[in-house]
């Protein structure tokens, strides 16, 4: 077995494989022993394992027997036996790494092993799937193993009630989609009572299709937002204005980072249109926001690629799956800018209440693991950002899929003509063909060329997503032609129909190289599952987006040297080297963008952690007076520092304003000063005496239940209000960072520095506002007591 594995993977992982195979051999030796156990004896193993862990043993100590138990139960309950390579996958996951397993190798069954082992620790296991359909399917299938062994299995889906969610999270193992776990985290930090939280502390997660979740979806932050009114008229005016803008004249578009910035000429046009002198004055910050969002909508978002319009509404499309993202909308007025661009009715704008990136959410798990068919190409990113390794797992049966060399054409038209003819040729032989496209627009374009060749097909894209799994599952039937946007239906096995093996299996035809070899490999992986025959080939053109956006000049220079046949197919062998080089450049750029965005979000993440920790203390502490007292002291010190300046003489101080500010905070011990005060020490002494007297009063009142309850409400309201305002300010700061970049300043350093200053200022306001509200609370409570 080991020699077979070596040949399959290569010698770089030989040491790791030897280590895993030694454990697999131990598990295999236990199989006869497990087969002799009764169902009841197998069930009792769970309690035995828990007792061993409680007595000081580690999960590694019980791993071999636990895996052997799960394998035996899977045989009895599901009629499925884990192969040796699946056991290796389970061991990789249990360690907190990524198991790279080919399509069709039974990743779902693999997850049953580490999820059981880690659930025995009693801290909860989260199994993350690509969509709701897979979460339900896997919970119902693999959940049978765990429930047989006495563990509880939960399902976490959108639109569940808080009570249902709490129950799901209390289960030993919880299935669901990653975004919903992230949204629950944000919602838990918006509650006003600790008992309303649904999650418990994080422990261990297994992410299916981990590359899709942590890399592809990482560009889109999770945002909880509410509705707020925006200026409909300004959106329409800005949309009309930028429609007349010219690239490189009025704005600069960076195709690599997908950013746009106004040039000096563009700025002048905006100032002239609105009759203002300086667009960058603080008073025009909101106007700048409307204009830049209109420009983004105009340049960065393409209809039927990034969004579709259905029933007069803009619906976003997931760039990586081609699915419509139901219920999702862009924040900060960008969605409304797209509506204005399309001349649609403007909906209410979303105001951000809470947000977090996918990366920073999953970095909170102490142990993170995952499975995918394609991760090795992004191993450095997984190591740098998440500290996890990618371990390739050999296939159970040798892979016999044939990956044919790319066919590269000069023009898109020539490419699509060739695609249609190739599909027709294979269709006439009865071989099923799966055509992978990168957008809805491209799907529909391919469909037109197939119509011309009178080839019947099924079109699967964001507009027809309802039967996705069924359509993909049928794609391996004889004579079937399926056009699928990107990796739609991922997680659904394509089973070959009768007689298809003899025809060469499923043929996958890619119509464009993706921005990552990993996604190309995902598409190829739809064919040749579990040792089935199959083939793949990409048809690409030098007019494809990848070349236009990232290598326009080099492509134009190269064209003059190229030779083609009568179909427009390029004959030069070095064209393949050029294509690979451009794709690697794009991969590097995309990684840099993700890394840049993560560095920016790390600033927000630190701030979010501070605010959420304070919020949690307010929720969980019984004595909130103890939390307020340091705030009162700090707020009073800052008032003195603001008005009694050491570089001025006391006669120059604004003593009246200082006294007013202090007396709003210090209740029942009014502060007065000589006119003018003797010196700064005199001021500080009097303030300290008054504050300590007031603190003593608060200490006496802290047993008052109503005071503690009202303090909790006031503190949370103030924190949430100013945190939401701060999120808006940070979004505007981030927006302006692009302009600074244009001015050759380091954007990340500036964002860190200015973001910290803004956070510090916000926190000081929070302390002051809570202090003022505390004084008012105390006053109203004493008045109530006096009246009763």
Swiss-Prot record:
Enzyme class: translocase
Chief localisation class: membrane
Location within or outside the cell: Cell membrane; Cytoplasm
PROSITE patterns: SECA_MOTOR_DEAD
Bilayer topology term: Peripheral membrane protein
Plastid listed as a keyword: no
Pfam families, sorted: P-loop_SecA (PF21090), SecA_DEAD (PF07517), SecA_PP_bind (PF01043), SecA_SW (PF07516)
GO aspect biological process, one term: protein import
GO MF annotation terms: ATP binding; protein-exporting ATPase activity
UniProt keyword terms in alphabetical order: ATP-binding, Cell membrane, Cytoplasm, Membrane, Nucleotide-binding, Protein transport, Translocase, Translocation, Transport
Any single Gene Ontology cellular-component annotation: cell envelope Sec protein transport complex
Known function: Part of the Sec protein translocase complex. Interacts with the SecYEG preprotein conducting channel. Has a central role in coupling the hydrolysis of ATP to the transfer of proteins into and across the cell membrane, serving as an ATP-driven molecular motor driving the stepwise translocation of polypeptide chains across the membrane.
Family: Belongs to the SecA family.
NCBIfam families given in the database record: PRK09200.1 (NF006630), secA (TIGR00963), SecA2_Bac_anthr (TIGR04397)
Quaternary context: Monomer and homodimer. Part of the essential Sec protein translocation apparatus which comprises SecA, SecYEG and auxiliary proteins SecDF. Other proteins may also be involved.
UniProt name for this protein: Protein translocase subunit SecA 2
Source species: Geobacillus thermodenitrificans (strain NG80-2)
């Amino acid at each position: 077995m080991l020699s077979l594995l070596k040949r399959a993977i290569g010698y770089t992982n030989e040491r790791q494989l030897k280590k895993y195979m030694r454990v697999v051999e131990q598990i295999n030796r236990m199989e006869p022993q497990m087969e002799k156990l009764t169902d009841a004896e197998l069930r009792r193993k769970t309690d035995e394992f828990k007792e061993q862990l409680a007595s000081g043993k580690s999960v590694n100590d019980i791993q071999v027997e636990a895996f052997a138990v799960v394998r035996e139960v899977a045989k009895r309950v599901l009629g499925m036996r884990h192969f040796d390579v699946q056991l290796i996958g389970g061991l990789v996951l249990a360690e907190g790494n990524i198991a790279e397993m080919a399509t069709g190798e039974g990743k779902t069954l693999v997850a049953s092993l580490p999820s059981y082992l880690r659930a025995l620790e009693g801290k909860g296991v989260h199994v993350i799937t690509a969509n709701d359909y897979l979460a339900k399917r896997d919970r119902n299938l693999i959940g049978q193993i765990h429930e047989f062994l006495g563990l509880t299995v939960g399902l976490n889906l959108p639109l569940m009630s808080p009570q249902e969610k709490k129950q799901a999270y209390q289960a030993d193992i919880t299935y669901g989609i990653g975004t919903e776990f992230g949204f629950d985290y944000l919602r838990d930090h918006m509650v006003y009572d600790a008992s309303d939280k649904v999650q418990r502390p994080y422990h261990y997660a297994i992410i299916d299709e981990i590359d899709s979740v942590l890399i592809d979806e990482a560009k889109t932050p999770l945002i909880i937002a509410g509705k707020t009114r925006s200026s409909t008229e300004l959106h329409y005016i800005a949309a009309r204005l930028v429609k007349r803008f010219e690239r490189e004249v009025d704005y600069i578009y960076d195709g690599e980072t997908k950013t746009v910035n106004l040039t000096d000429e563009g700025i002048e046009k905006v100032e002239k249109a609105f009759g203002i002198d300086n667009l960058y004055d603080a008073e025009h910050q909101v106007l700048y926001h409307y204009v830049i969002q209109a420009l983004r909508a105009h340049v960065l978002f393409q209809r039927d690629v990034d969004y579709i319009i259905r029933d007069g509404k803009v619906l976003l499309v997931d760039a990586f799956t081609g699915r419509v993202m139901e219920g999702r909308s862009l924040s900060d007025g960008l969605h409304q800018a797209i509506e204005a661009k399309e001349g649609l009715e403007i909906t209410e704008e979303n105001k951000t209440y809470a947000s977090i990136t996918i990366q920073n959410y999953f970095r909170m798990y102490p142990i993170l693991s995952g499975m995918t068919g394609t991760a090795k190409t992004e191993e450095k990113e997984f190591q740098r950002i998440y500290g996890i390794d990618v371990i390739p797992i050999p296939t159970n049966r040798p892979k016999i899929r044939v990956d044919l060399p790319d066919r590269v054409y000069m023009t898109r038209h020539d490419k699509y003509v060739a695609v249609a003819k190739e599909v027709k040729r294979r269709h006439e032989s009865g071989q099923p063909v799966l055509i992978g496209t990168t957008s809805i627009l491209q799907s529909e374009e391919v469909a037109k060329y197939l119509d011309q060749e009178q080839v019947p097909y099924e079109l699967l894209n964001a507009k027809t997503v309802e039967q996705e799994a069924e359509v993909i599952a049928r794609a391996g039937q004889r004579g079937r032609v399926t056009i699928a946007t990107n990796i739609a239906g991922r997680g659904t096995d394509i089973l070959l129909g009768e007689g298809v093996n003899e025809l060469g299996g499923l043929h996958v035809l890619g119509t464009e190289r993706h921005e990552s070899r990993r996604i190309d490999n995902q598409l190829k992986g739809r064919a040749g599952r579990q040792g089935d025959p199959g083939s793949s080939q990409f048809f690409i053109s030098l007019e494809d987006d990848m070349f236009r956006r990232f290598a326009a000049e080099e492509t134009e220079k190269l064209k003059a040297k190229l030779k083609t046949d009568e179909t427009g197919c390029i004959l030069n062998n070095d064209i393949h080297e050029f294509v690979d080089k451009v794709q690697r450049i794009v991969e590097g750029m995309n990684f840099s963008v993700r890394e840049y965005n993560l560095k920016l979000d790390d600033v927000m993440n630190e701030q979010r952690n501070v605010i959420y920790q304070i919020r949690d203390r307010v929720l969980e502490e019984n004595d909130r007076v103890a939390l307020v007292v340091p705030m009162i002291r700090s707020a009073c010190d800052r008032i003195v520092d603001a008005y009694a300046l050491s570089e001025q003489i006391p006669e120059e101080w604004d003593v009246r304003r200082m006294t007013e500010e202090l007396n709003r905070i210090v209740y029942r011990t009014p502060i007065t000063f000589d006119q003018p005060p003797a010196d700064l020490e005199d001021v500080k002494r009097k303030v300290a005496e008054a504050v300590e007297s007031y603190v003593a009063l608060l200490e006496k009142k802290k047993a008052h239940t109503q005071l503690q309850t009202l303090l909790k409400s006031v503190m949370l309201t103030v924190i949430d209000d100013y945190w939401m305002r701060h999120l808006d300010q940070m979004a505007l700061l981030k927006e302006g960072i692009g302009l600074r970049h244009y001015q050759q300043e380091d954007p990340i350093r500036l964002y860190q520095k200015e973001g910290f200053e803004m956070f510090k200022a916000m926190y000081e306001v929070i302390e002051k506002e809570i202090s003022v509200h505390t004084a008012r609370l105390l006053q109203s409570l004493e008045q109530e007591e006096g009246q009763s």
